[in-house]
Swiss-Prot record:
GO cellular component, one term: cytoplasm
Lineage, broadest ranks: Eukaryota, Metazoa, Chordata, Craniata, Vertebrata
Assembly description: Found in a U snRNA export complex with PHAX/RNUXA, NCBP1/CBP80, NCBP2/CBP20, RAN, XPO1 and m7G-capped RNA. Part of a precomplex with PHAX/RNUXA, NCBP1/CBP80, NCBP2/CBP20 and m7G-capped RNA. Interacts with NCBP1/CBP80. Found in a complex with snoRNA. Interacts with NCBP2/CBP20. Interacts with DDX39A; this interaction stimulates PHAX RNA binding activity.
One Pfam family per UniProt: PHAX_RNA-bd
UniProt modification remark: Phosphorylated in the nucleus. Dephosphorylated in the cytoplasm.
Presence of the UniProt keyword Ribosomal protein in the record: no
Biased composition (Basic and acidic residues): 164-184, 364-385
Region listing for Sufficient for poly U RNA-binding, in residue ranges: 219-319
Name the record gives this protein: Phosphorylated adapter RNA export protein
Length: 385
């Protein structure tokens, strides 16, 4: 056995497994203690390495040298030299925690902001709206859905007020916006564009439904002229045909068609173009062959209605002034020796109360004075007033 061991070279193992006994080596543990930190890294490897147990002291010394040489080679191969670290391990381990903390704070900040916006939306009553709001701009997020809803609601309310004022004007002979003027809020609303107030421009129908001649009846001629002019006031056109005759009315219709084809006419202030009916009536007033008496007869009913509206508005203003004066007098306390102030206020109060009595009696005289006569530029001016 010793001879076989002597014949083998250093570091060579025997092929027979029966002669070997696997025992842990005690010497490497002692070497690890002597070497200190450098041998501590090789201590676990010594348990894995197996050596052959022999009785000869020389063989044991050779095996010890082989083991130490192998350990040194093993350490060089598998233990790379330590690299200098720029930062300690403890600091590098704390950085992810800080980064993670910022991310968590950002998430909770976004959640808190979203909850605040949802709370505001709940208070405003917009839970039923469609779609979602883009919150990418965070605090600068614009709730366009709420803006559209509020704009639509305001538009509907404004339309209802206009319809109500129109009904009062048509049925009660009241001007639109009279309530606003009484409350002192008439100047708060912005003037609407012309297209919203008057609608789309009315175009003249040049061909018409059928041809008209002087021999046709006045009713047929008036109906066809009103149709071609797209004029809603057919009674006014009928009076024109009745007073001027079929021939003159047809001539005015032809002149109106020519003016409309050339671009139309502007109203007096130049803010918009006249309607075909307005052009027809303007030509009627500016025709030398038509007398002033005929023009007054044609527009008598419109002028009378306009005069009554102005008179009613004047009475309403006087009545409102009388009420304010009456309330002011009730709020004042006069002394017994202040006779001058009593007489002054009494005279003013009597005039105001007299105007109140006149307003309560009902509609006044309907006779049109010569100096109050009004010439209408075109029929739609009556509705705009």
């Amino acid at each position: 056995m010793a001879l076989e061991a002597g014949d083998m070279e250093e570091g060579q193992l025997s092929d027979s497994d029966s002669d070997m006994t696997v025992v842990p080596s005690d010497r490497p543990l002692q070497m690890a203690k002597v070497l200190g930190g450098g041998g501590a890294a090789c201590a676990p490897v010594s348990n894995y390495r197996t050596v052959k147990h022999v009785d000869s002291s020389e063989e044991s010394l050779d095996s010890d040298d082989d083991c130490s040489l192998w350990k040194r080679k093993r350490q060089k191969c598998h233990s790379p030299p330590p690299k200098p670290e720029p930062f300690p391990f403890g600091q590098s381990g704390q950085k992810p925690a800080l980064n993670g903390g910022k991310k968590v704070n950002n998430i909770w900040g976004a959640v808190l902001q979203e909850q605040n916006q949802d709370a505001v939306a709940t208070e405003l009553g917009i839970l039923g709206m469609e779609g979602t709001i883009d919150r990418s701009r965070q605090s600068e997020t614009y709730n366009y859905l709420l803006a559209k809803k509020l704009a639509k609601k305001e538009s509907q309310e404004y339309t209802k007020e206009l319809d109500k004022d129109l009904d009062e004007y048509m049925h009660g002979d009241k001007k639109p916006g009279s309530k606003e003027e009484e409350n002192g809020q008439g100047h708060l609303k912005r003037k609407r564009p012309v297209r919203d107030r008057l609608g789309n421009r009315v175009e003249m129908n040049y061909k018409g439904r059928y041809d008209i001649t002087e021999e046709d009846s006045p009713e047929k001629v008036a109906d066809e002229i009103a149709f071609r002019l797209q004029e809603p006031k057919k009674d006014l056109i009928a009076r024109v045909v009745t007073i001027l005759g079929n021939k003159k009315a047809i001539e005015l219709l032809m002149e109106t068609a020519e003016v409309e084809q050339n671009g139309g006419l502007f109203i007096m202030n130049g803010s918009r173009r006249r309607t075909p009916g307005g052009v027809f009536l303007n030509l009627l007033k500016n025709t030398p062959s038509i007398s002033e008496e005929q023009i007054k007869d044609i527009f008598y009913i419109e002028n009378q209605k306009e005069y009554e509206n102005k008179k009613a508005a004047r009475k309403r203003r006087t009545q409102l002034l009388g009420k304010k004066m009456k309330e002011a007098i009730k709020s004042l306390n006069f002394q017994e020796d202040d006779d001058t102030s009593r007489e002054t206020f009494a005279s003013d109060t009597n005039e105001a109360l007299a105007s109140l009595d006149e307003a309560q009696e009902g509609p006044g005289e309907t006779k049109l004075d010569a100096e109050d006569a009004i010439e209408v530029d075109h029929p739609q001016d009556l509705d705009i007033f």
